[in-house]
Amino acid sequence: MTDFGDFVRRRRERLRATDKTFSVRQLARRVDVQPSYLSKVERGEVAPPSEVTIVRIAKELDVDADVLLALAGKVSSDLQAVIRRRPELFGELIRQLRGMPDRAVLRLVREVRDGDW
């Protein structure tokens, strides 16, 4: 089982405990894949789906798409475009952030977002 598939299965089952529309069959229909394929994804028998399908699954499961993409070993296409424009800077930025506590990273993100830099 993959981290991606396991996460999707656990999240879907948690939601299904209170909402029966989260069966494999019904979720598969809403994200436009075959139920057998989604079942195989959950069991880790096939590779995670495309970015488009992962984003649909994330929306249905009320999970941040970047979290599911990361679990699938993928990076969203919008982030890929940003990284390709400045690969050295982003590589170094990520390496520097690696050792920082989450609270410090969040503070830095807020400062950049709010223009306080």
Model-derived regions: residue spans:
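Short, solvent-exposed alpha-helical "recognition" segments
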Residues: 17-18, 45-50, 76-78
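Short alpha-helical DNA-recognition segment
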Residues: 17-40, 70
